């Protein structure tokens, strides 16, 4: 597959043209990549008005992912999330009342800032009480979604879309096919934050990408699981989305810099050639190595590794339940760090390890050696550790559902605010989302009144300060 952006920039660098244009480094500098860092010079195209090499590269990505249309972002899935919500708002019927989105509660804070910028409300889908033991996960069954939509309809409210995160930070995958069928039966678009799942289209057994499963709008963080520089992402449109080219590019431009990174654009462009060539085989090898390691861990400490297989699990994320080692997630992460392995995420319960198709045999061997050593040295699984308490999330959900909303998300985010100790926040209006990052998933959402039920979760996830609206 051709790489028009990469080819153009390399030719330009080789020509040794005198650069009387931005950037100021003029192709020289300490990093070594400066000669490939350009701006929108003649022939380089423009990301938000693409007609040349960028449009050609995006057409290649569209073909690879099998979408109706795929667009590039150099500012991560956060930009794509805001853009696809803007598009969904534009598609809603005129004079439909104040806009409301139905969304699973484990959403990234980018959704909340989109709600503040675009001024819509969010009706939350909470996990069932027996499935609510972790901040990152919010399983939604089709029946529960259908019931929630019926309840909103009975109140005279029709959401402009349904929003899900799949896969989530712990590797849980929603039933996108079943949930999209419910959405479409109600005449609603399904929007999916697939930031962690760009690779799902390239599985040997067939695509598990949300667009192929019925999602209408979807974002992928290419940089999370593909060989792409940080910030590279995709906005995908499904076949049912009736939005013209200009509307989509305008939506992205609304939330993006007018100076998109050409290093990231080249990275996205180069990835197309990799995805079209050897990526599936390399991905399969990575999955095989990860499966072998998972089976070894099951033999050493049953219950340590969450399954890699099954309809609701993604196959490229190793999530470890640290309680099987008598440790907290943070303790297990530190033990790995001391042995030369850095994990993606750790909380009181779990750690998340994210290999990719680019992970080498030597890197897997290093991880294997480290985990074997920790398993040999760790205490028994019955040592007291901070465990997940589904009741804590259920209690928070009940408290928040029962309270009246005094501020919209937009009003709370833009209001004068102050930082106070989290333990003193009860009864105050949350201004900025109360999150730890990663995973950037809020315990409290802007505009909500902090109930006592939030305090145990603040403590569990290390949130010591809360931004509240000034009184």
Could you tell me what each predicted segment is?
Residues 298-452, 457-463:
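Conserved C-terminal alpha-helix-loop-beta "cap" of PLP-dependent enzymes
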Residues 68-70, 97-101, 442-443:
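Short active-site oxyanion
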Residues 72, 124-126, 220, 345, ...:
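Structural signal for conserved beta-strand scaffold positions within catalytic alpha/beta enzyme cores
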Residues 428, 467-470:
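Flexible, glycine-rich loop/tail regions that form catalytic "lids" or insertion modules at the edges
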Residues 2-10, 76-306, 322:
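Conserved PLP-enzyme active-site core in the AAT-like
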Residues 1-52:
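N-terminal "arm"/small-domain region of PLP-dependent enzymes with the aminotransferase-like
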Residues 34-79:
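Conserved N-terminal alpha-helix of the aminotransferase class I/II PLP-enzyme fold
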